[in-house]
Every structure is written in C-alpha cells, then in structure tokens.
C-alpha cells in the first residue's frame, strides 16, 4: 500500500498506524531501495567485467543490453528516493501540525493556557507575544516549536 494511503488512513482514523510509524515505513522503503540499487550496481560491474572479457560481438551486445536495463532500474530508484524523502518531510510537518492543533484543542477542554503561551513564546522570534505568518510558516517547515 502506498505511503499516502497509509497516511490518509492514519488521518481518517481507520487504522492504528501512528505518524511515527508512517515515518519509519518511509525510512524502511528508502533503505530497501538503496539496498536494491547497490545490488544493481554490483550486477552492472559484473556485467561490464564479463563484457570486457569476451570477444564475441553477440555476447558483448547482450551484456550491453543487460547493463542498460540495470542502469535504467537504478535511474528509477534514484528518482523514487527524493519523492519518498518529500513524503517523509510532509509527514513530519503533519506531526508538528497535529501537535500544534492538539495544544489549541486542549484549550477547549479547559487544560492549561500556559501550554499555548509557552508554545507561542518558543515560536515567537521577535518577542512581540504573537506568532505572525512568517513564524508560523517557519515552525511548520522545520517541525520545531523552539526557534530559540
């Protein structure tokens, strides 16, 4: 199941997967792709060595075809890894947003206003007691509530 489907299920509440588990799944997928790519690179080197040791043109052509196919697979993997890293970054931002809105939500439940005041103080870079758009955007990009 693609990571976005897991994430959607997590947000919609129809699974027990947590955001940290979703991040771990993305990390695992990236590690698996890197391992696969290393295997392809080994196979490419082996095919190049075998090609270089033969004088039969048909065999050389066959090795060249194999090398091209393996290189194409490596290229696909190298395109997928940045996409997965972007997904991981989006999930991390979601975790920050859930924390932020959880703190705001706790006010409705009568929980300590001090929690939100402390959060605002941590994010408020210019010390004027408010979180402006730039500060909020920075908090959401970094996933960090403490800019100081």
From Swiss-Prot:
Keyword Isomerase: no
Induction: By touch and during darkness conditions.
SUPFAM superfamilies: EF-hand (SSF47473)
Residues passing through the membrane, by range: none
Protein origin, superkingdom: Eukaryota
InterPro entries, per database record: EF-hand-dom_pair, EF_hand_dom
UniProt domain EF-hand: residue ranges: 111-146
Entries under SMART domains matching the protein: EFh
Pfam families given in the database record: EF-hand_1
Coiled coil spans: 17-61
Keywords per UniProt: Calcium, Coiled coil
Gene3D superfamilies documented for this protein: EF-hand
GO molecular function: calcium ion binding
Function: Potential calcium sensor.
Record's protein name: Probable calcium-binding protein CML1
Organism of this sequence: Arabidopsis thaliana (Mouse-ear cress)
Chain's gene name: CML1
